[in-house]
């Protein structure tokens, strides 16, 4: 179909060639798969069936994530025991890592088995793990949110900073998610708008692995347009 035409050429994703053919004001960006619309660099994620896209590619090796946890072993022995070394293994998304592990073994306001400040340790673990994927300043902002009692705050902060990292890395001004199946389109300009799009239902998903299963791209937030 036309929406799949050109996919994979010059890093083009589904729908990008198709949209570029609709108007002389829409052009393929030179040397990459993004679009330029009226002179504005646009990053397009086109959802053609089910599933959407992720805000990034690549990601750290799982063993590098486990090594970060092991650095804090005296404070989180149960967590280190659960997440064993290996190219593949047990995983946890951000919400489950917070609610099932950190809230259980490092509750905010408490003291760790080694006498450390739980809130500070939570923030340090978050910062160090996120730094493997995003670097600074994004990882520091994400990690600081691990000191909040509400897991949704941490998730939304991660989504917003993931977007800001992605925007800086790929040098675009506007992010567009389009579903040909449901004929819906969402436009995002900044990280706060991205987080809000998930909160109000314009986008679904938002999940990202804190410790991935072996697929490093799981570390980036995923987005879908809900079907009508």
Where are these predicted regions, by residue range?
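Short, positively charged
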Residues: 1-33, 40, 44-228
């Amino acid at each position: 179909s036309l929406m799949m035409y050109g996919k994979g050429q010059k890093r083009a994703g589904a729908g990008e060639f198709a949209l570029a053919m609709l108007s002389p004001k829409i052009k393929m960006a030179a040397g990459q798969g993004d679009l330029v619309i009226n002179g504005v660099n646009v990053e397009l994620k086109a959802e053609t069936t089910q599933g959407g896209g992720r805000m990034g590619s690549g990601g750290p090796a799982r063993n590098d994530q486990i090594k970060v946890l092991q650095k804090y072993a005296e404070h989180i022995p149960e967590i280190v025991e659960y997440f064993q070394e290996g190219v593949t293994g047990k995983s946890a998304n951000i919400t489950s890592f917070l609610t099932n592990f950190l809230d259980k073994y490092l509750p905010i306001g408490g003291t760790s088995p080694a006498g450390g400040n739980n809130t500070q340790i939570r923030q340090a673990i978050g910062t160090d793990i996120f730094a493997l994927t995003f670097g600074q300043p994004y990882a520091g902002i994400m990690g600081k949110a691990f000191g909040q009692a509400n897991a949704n705050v941490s998730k939304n902060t991660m989504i917003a900073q993931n977007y800001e990292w992605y925007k800086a890395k790929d040098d675009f001004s506007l992010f567009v998610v389009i579903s040909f199946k449901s004929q819906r389109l969402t436009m995002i300009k900044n990280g706060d708008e991205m987080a809000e799009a998930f909160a109000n239902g314009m986008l679904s998903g938002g999940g990202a692995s804190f410790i991935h299963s072996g697929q490093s791209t799981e570390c980036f937030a995923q987005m879908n347009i809900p079907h009508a």
